[in-house]
Amino acid sequence: MNLSSLPHRLLAAAVALCAIAAPASAERIKDLAQVGGVRGNALVGYGLVVGLDGSGDRTSQAPFTVQSLKNLLGELGVNVPANVNPQLKNVAAVAIHAELPPFAKPGQPIDITVSSIANAVSLRGGSLLMAPLKGADGQVYAMAQGNLVVGGFGAQGKDGSRVSVNIPSVGRIPNGATVERALPDVFAGSGEITLNLHQNDFTTVSRMVAAIDNSFGAGTARAVDGVTVSVRSPTDPSARIGLLARLENVELSPGDAPAKVVVNARTGTVVIGQLVRVMPAAIAHGSLTVTISENTNVSQPGAFSGGRTAVTPQSTIKATSEGSRMFKFEGGTTLDQIVRAVNEVGAAPGDLVAILEALKQAGALTAELEVI
C-alpha cells in the first residue's frame, strides 16, 4: 500500500463527502422555512460570581468588581466605607447571556451562559448572585442565579505561572434564569401566516406555493419574494395552530442548490457543490518554498585583551522551487475529475484552493466562489 498517497485519497474522500448534493427526496416545510414572528430574543446582563477558591478577579486591576460588590452590599443594608477597597480573590465580575425562546411565559426556566469580564483565572465552584437579564429594549425579561457548571480547569501561581485546560473562565447554569416578562404576542390576530425560507430560492418558493394550494385549495398561498410565502389563515388562535400543524408537514421537493465552492483559506478546507462545472482551461501551478534559519555565534575575546564578548546572529536563507504542474480541464469537467486531477500529481489541499481561485478569476469556474 502506498502510504504517501493516503492523505490525497483522504482529501478526495472528504471533498466528495462534503459535496452539496441536490436533494433527491421531498422535504417538509418545517425543515425548509420558519414561521414569521416565531423567533428567540437575545438577553444580556451583568453580575457577580462569588465563592471562588482564590481564582477570582485581582481587584487591584479590576476596580469595577469592587464597585459592583459595594453596590450589592449597599442594597442588602451593609455599608462599606468609600475609602475601603477590599482585596478579594473569591469574586468575579461576569457577563451573562441567554436566549429567550418564542412563547416563553413568566415562571419558565431558561439556560444561561456566564463569562468572566476581568482577569479571573477560573469560575469553577462559583455561584452567580441574582442578576437581571435585559432585552434590546432595555426591559428586564428574566432573573438569573445559581451554581455554575464549568468544563475547564485553571490555576495560577504567585509568580504568575499559569495552567489551564479548556476554557475555565466560561460556565453554564442549566435552568439558571427564570422568565419574568413575556414577549408581546405577534402570532395571533393576523389573517395571514408568513413562511420565510432559510435560504432564498425562487424555485423552492414556487413549489411551496403549489404544494400548499394542492393541500388546502387554490389561492391559499401566494409568493411574496424569493424568501417569503404568505398563507391565508383564520384569526382564531386554535384554528391557526391547527392550520400550522398541518402546514408544516406538507412535503415538497426544493430547488437544486446553486453551484457553489466554499474555500477556507486558513485551513485548506474546500467544499464543492455537485453541480459545479469547469469550462475548458489549462493551469500551470508551481510553488516556491523559502526557508530561513537563524544561528547565534558568540565572539569571546582573549584574556586581558580589553575586548568585550559579542553575540552575532547568522542567518541562512534557502529558496527552493518545485516543478510546475500542468492541469488541463475540458468543458463540463465535474467535481470528481477536478479532485482526481489534482490528487494524481500529489498536490496538497492548499494547491487545490489556489487552482480554484485561478479558475474563477479566468472565468472558467461556473460557480460562486466563497472564501471564508
Curated annotation (Swiss-Prot):
GO biological process: bacterial-type flagellum-dependent cell motility
Taxonomic superkingdom: Bacteria
Complex and partners: The basal body constitutes a major portion of the flagellar organelle and consists of four rings (L,P,S, and M) mounted on a central rod.
MF terms (GO), sorted A to Z: structural molecule activity
Chief location: periplasm
Protein name in UniProt: Flagellar P-ring protein
Signal peptide interval: 1-26
Keyword Translocase: no
